[in-house]
Curated annotation (Swiss-Prot):
Annotated residues for binding of ATP: 339
Biological process per Gene Ontology, one example term: methionyl-tRNA aminoacylation
Name of this chain's protein: Methionine--tRNA ligase
Positions occupied by motif 'KMSKS' region: 336-340
UniProt family annotation: Belongs to the class-I aminoacyl-tRNA synthetase family. MetG type 1 subfamily.
Function in brief: Is required not only for elongation of protein synthesis but also for the initiation of all mRNA translation through initiator tRNA(fMet) aminoacylation.
A GO molecular function held by the record: tRNA binding
Domain (tRNA-binding): residue spans on this chain: 600-701
Stored PROSITE patterns: AA_TRNA_LIGASE_I, TRBD
Cofactor notes: Binds 1 zinc ion per subunit.
Enzyme class: ligase
């Protein structure tokens, strides 16, 4: 086996708020993948850090009457506590407010400047004359210039959905001091992303080398534009004092924008680890490095990681990521997390309610498939699945067999001829097991496929134990050897299943290692042509007394959790603008279209359609060709959803189409209708999907 050298990162949580269950999707996903790779025997380092700079941190510290350094130190402790509670095993968890990150931020900036990729331009912004600072968009409020609604933010109106700049607001005021802002010009520093050296590199990098998922690469193609055009804009990388961050070298009262030094925090954190453990930093970061570098991120920050970041690294003489893995958002009970419903759940509250963190790790693993699709935490399904899969199926194997081994056989599994008979049973009954399928699913981050395969094998073990019925055999003293074989078989298969689940359930795996009296659950390796039985525990192996491993979820615990968060959040008055992502990506709602009559609407024939096939369209950057079943016939439709969907993931899905739209002749063929999808400034397209029970051909009314 070739040993791989791998560096893995998760996106840096902002040092201005609590970790919640939405954040944990990414850290659990990354941790599972890292643990799997380490079980393969590879050299893997997993680093992360608090994203500790920016205006929101500076202002919050001021409100609390403490220094920004004191604030980020406190939040760092809270974040690390929560991550540890969910068994996230970083090799290094650091802060961007560090000497290491400062060094690499300045180094990259100086190299970009020397390459002629830094430009200085004067821009006009709103300025708070009381606080003496320039106001980010979301720190300005006023009257909407379109509809006149009051108390609207500086970038968009929540009443009519209009988008605008802060300088267009009527009667603007500072959301910090209440003062009327003035217009003031200032010199800002820009990374010239539009330079052909960047745009040409990114066009090639995003489309080659499997650096991005298909959906992500398609989205990058949209942002880059068609061949021959350049839709990229230069990136403002500076902020004016007062600001909490790193000063730009050689400048006065100019600071690096938080999004410049945030990804550089990956380098700073790893450098800290290198210093502590004697690791060669250049082996992982120099241009041309043969080691592997993977970034796990949310799809909302794809723009920064797949455009700005690789362009900066390439032009500053560093290596670029091997791959960037983007995941979707978390919904709870099918809806956005809500403070009023108590579903905006913090990691701290989950742990304080004494819920097992591995329940959530398992549920997320069962949902994550390596794509950018959103995942839903359905709390009722959460209870059902954990209780049925983990307790009712998996743990049940050990609990039904271990007692007999300890009580009747002094903790020893079968040996000699009975061990050979056990091996024969394993190879005959479990011939369909495919350990390689589980391994491939973990490697591809398709944890849901891995869990499905493991649970199918778990069902097979339970079926055999049910047939053997050791609890019945135990009633007949003449069948002692048969009882010993049956229970030993259960324990042996429980051992294998535990090895496969160890990346997901690391704490339970440690307890199982004690129970099985086995130093460490390693990844079972089945050599080519070798039967499954060669991966079992040794003949005559002695186990320890069984102690209960995982308890069931009581639905009352979930009710208490949501109630605790509802009560906590109703007393919280944190402003919207305290998160970095509020600066990075704002939601703009399009205005409602002109009113139509019911007669006009009734002319539209909307039908449920099943996607029978989905294919790329040669020569089209944005289109997929869909073959739709609408009950009475099939239709071919061209849909502009290529940037968001892999064709293979669409097959079999239900959607909604306009069935009576006149066919449209396109250069790629005839489009016989239109599928419905949602999109906006914050993302999309998102294909509409009907509720379960809908059938192809049904009319939507």
């Amino acid at each position: 086996m070739t040993v791989r050298n791998i560096l893995v990162t998760s996106a840096l949580p902002y040092a201005n708020g609590s970790i919640h269950l939405g954040h944990l999707v990414e850290y659990i996903q990354t941790d599972i993948w890292v643990r799997f790779q380490k079980m393969q025997g590879h050299t893997v380092y997993y680093v992360c850090a608090d994203d500790a700079h920016g205006t929101p941190i500076m202002l919050r510290a001021e409100r609390e009457g403490i220094s920004p350094e004191a604030l980020i130190a406190r939040v760092y402790t809270e974040h690390l506590r929560d991550f540890t509670g969910f068994h996230i095993a970083f090799d290094q968890y650091y802060s961007t407010h560090s000497d290491e990150t400062r060094y690499y931020a300045e180094d990259i900036y100086q190299k970009l400047k020397a390459a002629g990729l830094i430009a200085i331009r004067s821009i006009e912004q709103l300025y708070d004359p009381v606080k003496n600072l320039f106001l980010p968009d979301r720190f300005v409020k006023g009257e909407c210039p379109k509809c006149g609604a009051v108390d609207q933010y500086g970038d968009s109106c929540e009443a009519c959905g209009a988008a605008y700049t802060p300088t267009e607001l009527k009667n603007p005021y500072s959301a910090i001091s209440g003062a009327t802002p003035i217009r003031k010009a200032s010199e800002h520093f820009f990374f010239k992303l539009s330079d052909p050296r960047c745009s040409d590199f990114l066009r090639k990098w995003t489309r080659s080398g499997n650096h991005l998922q298909v959906e992500a690469a398609n989205k990058m193609a949209e942002w880059l534009g068609e061949e021959g055009e350049n839709k990229l804009s230069d990136w403002d990388i500076s902020r004016d004092a007062p600001y909490f961050g790193f000063e730009i070298p050689g400048e006065t009262d100019k600071y690096f924008y938080v999004w410049l030094d945030a990804p550089i925090g990956y380098m700073g954190s790893f450098k800290k680890l290198c210093t502590e453990q004697g690791i060669d930093f250049d082996q992982y970061w120099k241009k041309g490095a043969t080691t592997e570098l993977y970034h796990f991120i949310g799809k909302d920050i794809l723009y920064f990681h797949a455009l700005f970041w690789p362009a900066m690294l390439e032009n500053a003489g560093y290596r670029t990521p091997t791959q960037i893995f983007a995941h979707g958002f978390l919904t709870v009970n099918g809806e956005k997390m809500s403070k009023s419903r108590g579903t905006f759940i913090t990691a701290e509250s989950y742990l304080q309610q004494r819920l097992n963190p591995e329940w959530l790790r398992y549920y997320y693993a069962a949902k994550l498939n390596g794509s950018m699709e959103d995942i839903d935490l359905n709390l009722e399904d959460f209870v059902t699945r954990v209780n049925a899969d983990l307790v009712g199926k998996y743990i049940n194997i050990a609990s039904r067999c271990a007692g007999f081994i300890s009580k009747c056989f002094d903790g020893k599994l079968v040996a000699g001829e009975d061990y050979q008979l056990l091996q024969q049973t394993v190879d005959e009954y479990f011939s369909s097991w495919q350990p390689g399928v589980i391994e491939a699913a973990y490697e591809a981050r398709d944890f849901s496929a891995a869990i499905r395969h493991i649970m199918k094998r778990t069902d097979e073990v339970n079926e055999l134990i049910h047939v053997l019925a050791p609890w019945e055999i135990a009633k007949d003293e003449t069948r002692e050897r048969e009882l010993h074989r049956a229970c030993s078989l259960g324990i042996q298969m429980f051992y294998l299943l535990s090895c496969y689940l160890k990346p997901v359930l690391p704490y339970t795996a440690e307890r199982i290692e004690h129970f099985l009296n086995w130093m460490a659950l390693g990844w079972p390796r089945q050599q080519a042509g070798q039967p499954l039985s060669t991966m079992l525990l040794p003949a005559g192996h002695t186990i320890n007394t069984y102690q209960h491993l995982i308890t069931r979820i009581d639905p009352k615990q979930i009710a208490a959790l949501t109630e605790a968060n509802r009560q906590t959040m109703t007393t919280s008055n944190d402003t919207h603008s305290l998160t970095r992502h509020a600066e990075a990506q704002q939601r703009v709602i399009a205005p409602i279209a002109e009113t139509i009559s019911i007669e006009d609407f009734s002319k539209i024939d909307l039908r449920i359609a099943r996607i029978l096939d989905a294919q790329h369209v040669p020569g089209a950057d944005k289109l997929l060709q869909l073959t739709l079943d609408i009950g009475s016939e099939q239709r071919s439709v061209f849909a502009g959803i290529k940037s968001a969907y892999d064709p293979e993931q669409l097959k079999g899905r239900l959607t909604v189409m306009v069935a009576n739209l006149a066919p449209r002749k396109m250069k790629f063929g005839l489009s016989e209708g239109m599928v419905l999808a949602a999109s906006g400034e914050s993302g999309g397209p998102f294909l509409l999907a009907p509720d379960s029970g809908a059938q192809p051909g049904m009319r939507v009314k």
